[in-house]
Structure formats: C-alpha cells, structure tokens
C-alpha cells in the first residue's frame, strides 16, 4: 500500500466505539491558507475538549503559513509527500514517516513540495 493509499484509508476509516465513518465527513478549505484542506475526524465534542484529530492536505508548492497555537500541543504525522517545516529555532524536511511535536506557543510553517503533503495532525487540548 502506498503512503497516499494509507492516507486515503484514514480519510475513509472508522472510529471504533462510535462507529463514526470518516468518509462521511466533508473536507473544507482552510480559512487562512490557500491550497490547504482539512477534515476534522475527531473533535472536542467527542472528547470533552481533551483532544482533536485532523487530516490535512497541502497542495503542491502551497503552505500553511507562519502561525501559532497558544494553548495546544500539536503533533504532525506525515503520511504522504515531502515538504519543509520551519520553526523559530529549526528547519526540518517533512517526508512520509516523519513525526513532529510542537509545544503550545511554538511558531511554525509547513511548505509542501512538488507532490503536495498529507499530514495527520493531533491537538491536545482540542483545536475545535
């Protein structure tokens, strides 16, 4: 199974216990960053605000610009594609298999490479 097929499997997966089908959840455009789509697969409503999980697609050569989450720790699991992640202190290549952890108040931006990049993002506490 390719990494893109793995991402698609998550996009159409199910949440055990609630039997929630992720395929029924609509992708939406990020309100600030062109070329970025998100799917909220587990939200604060289901976790009492404790955490949330999101699938993120960044189109080729597009980016999630410099931003910060004041209250959430965020993790990224890169499922498909390549790109670059920059923080104030570091710059690292993003590619399939890379995991990044950002404590609250960490500024970062993610730029997708030529094929785009697909990320599984998790927030503690929940983003939304």
Language-model regions: role of each:
Residues 1-50:
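A short, N-terminal "cap"/entry segment at the start of jelly-roll beta-barrel domains
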Residues 39-40, 52-70:
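Conserved short histidine dyad/triad with adjacent acidic residue
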Residues 46-50, 58-62, 82, 125-127:
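Short, charged/polar surface micro-motifs in flexible loops or helix N-caps
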Residues 60, 71-72, 90, 106-107, ...:
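A generic "binding-loop/recognition-motif" signal
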Residues 66, 85-86, 102, 108-114:
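Short beta-strand His + acidic residue motifs that chelate non-heme Fe in jelly-roll/DSBH
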Residues 71-74, 78-83:
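Glycine- and acidic-residue-biased ligand/ion/polar-headgroup-sensing regions
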Residues 75, 101, 115-128:
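A short hydrophobic beta-strand segment most commonly corresponding to one strand
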Residues 89-104:
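Short acidic-glycine-tyrosine-enriched beta hairpin
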């Amino acid at each position: 199974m390719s990494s893109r097929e793995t991402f698609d499997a998550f996009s159409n997966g199910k949440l055990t216990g609630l039997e929630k089908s992720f395929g029924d959840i609509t992708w939406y455009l990020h309100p600030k960053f062109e070329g970025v789509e998100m799917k909220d697969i587990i939200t604060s409503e289901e976790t009492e605000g404790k955490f949330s999980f999101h699938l993120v697609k960044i189109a080729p050569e597009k980016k999630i610009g410099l931003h910060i989450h004041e209250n959430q720790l965020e993790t990224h699991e890169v499922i498909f594609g390549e790109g670059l992640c920059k923080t104030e202190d570091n710059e690292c290549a993003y590619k399939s298999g890379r995991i990044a952890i950002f404590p609250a108040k960490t500024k970062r931006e993610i730029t997708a490479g030529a094929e785009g990049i697909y990320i599984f993002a998790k927030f503690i506490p929940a983003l939304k």
